[in-house]
C-alpha cells in the first residue's frame, strides 16, 4: 500500500513539475506546446485579427505562422529624424519565438541600419507601437531599439527570440538603395502595395 501511495506522489510531483516547466514560457498567456487552435483562440479573445497595420501612424504585429511551439512574427519600426519634417523610415523586423532560446544576430543589423539612418538624416526617433507592448528607445548609447513589453510576452524570451532583422519592403535591396530615393515616396508606394495584398487577409 505504501508503495502505491509513494508511486502516486511521485507521479503527481512529476506531472506537476512537467506542467510547471511547460507553463513557465507563455505567449499571450498560452503555454508553449499548445495547439494552433488554442493560440488562435487566445489571440482572438484579445481582439487581435492577425492583420498587419502599416500606415495609420503606427504599425501592428502580423502573426505570419504558428506551428505548435514555433511562432514567427513580423513587426515594423518607424523612424522619424530631426532633419526631416514628416518622412518616416520603416524597418521590418522578423523574429521567431521557440521553446529553445537562441542568439539574436539580427539586433546587430538593426543597430547598423539605425546608425546609417542617423548619419544621413540626423537623430532618429522611434514612433512605432505594437500589439502586446510598446517600443521605447535607447539611441544615445547604442542606437538600438529597446523593447519594453507588458506581461503578455516574456521579456527574456522576446529578446532571445530575434531571428532576423531586415529593412522593410525589399530586404538588402532596400538597405542598399533607400538613401538614393525619396524615402517617404518609396515607403508610401510599397506600403500601399502590401496593404492591398493584406486587405482581405486574416487567420
Range-by-range predicted roles:
Residues 21-60, 95-203:
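Non-cytosolic coordination micro-motifs
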Residues 62-111:
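Mid-chain, structured segments of secreted extracytoplasmic proteins
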Residues 4, 70-72, 82, 171-176:
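Short, structured coil/loop segments at alpha-helix boundaries
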Residues 11, 70, 82-84, 136-138, ...:
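Sterically constrained small-residue positions within well-ordered secondary structures
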Residues 15-20:
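Sec/Tat signal peptide C-region and signal peptidase I cleavage site
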